[in-house]
A protein has these predicted regions:
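Nucleotide-activated donor-dependent transferases that construct or modify glycoconjugates
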Residues: 1-18
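A short, active-site helix/loop in glycosyltransferases that binds the activated sugar's phosphate group
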Residues: 106-107, 127-129, 136-149
């Protein structure tokens, strides 16, 4: 199976600066690759990391990202442009796991070849799920998050 994993705009993978989501998906990507799946992870460019490399069977693609800010509107703007950069770079796959806000709003409709869209709702949603269409699966890490979706 071909699996793409899209991280947020502000941290790299493999994790070099924290990030529970980044650590979790990094470990899962390694497990998927060890099981014989073709895995591509998209994350932020980071000093000392090449833009493209393959580690333990996982292909890493690092794109221009931004630092996380204390302003929600600015983070949403960064996320929108991050989603657009990833959208243009995504290879054909069977599934694409998305860990950002804007990309799922248009990915399933505009690029079905990217794969069935799976979202991990790692935080309490703020209304973005109303904008999502053609989502194959939403993963909720807790009952509280599931009820808010």
């Amino acid at each position: 199976m071909k699996i793409s994993i899209v991280m947020g705009f502000f941290l790299p993978v493999p994790p070099a600066a924290g990030g529970a989501t980044e650590k979790t998906w990094h470990r899962l990507a390694l497990e998927f690759a060890a099981a014989g799946h073709e895995v591509t992870v998209f994350s932020r460019r980071w000093p000392g990391f090449p833009d493209r490399e393959t580690l333990s069977g996982v292909q890493h693609v690092r794109l221009r990202g931004c630092a996380h800010t204390p302003r929600l509107w600015r983070n949403l703007l960064h996320d929108f442009f991050w989603g657009w950069r990833v959208f243009r770079a995504l290879p054909p796959a069977d599934i694409v796991i998305v860990n950002c806000v804007a990309l799922p709003a248009w990915l399933g409709a505009l690029r079905p070849s990217a794969g069935r869209v799976v979202i991990l709702a790692g935080r309490i949603p703020k209304g973005q799920f109303r904008c999502y269409r053609r989502i194959a699966r939403i993963l909720a890490p807790s009952t509280t998050v599931r009820e808010k979706i």
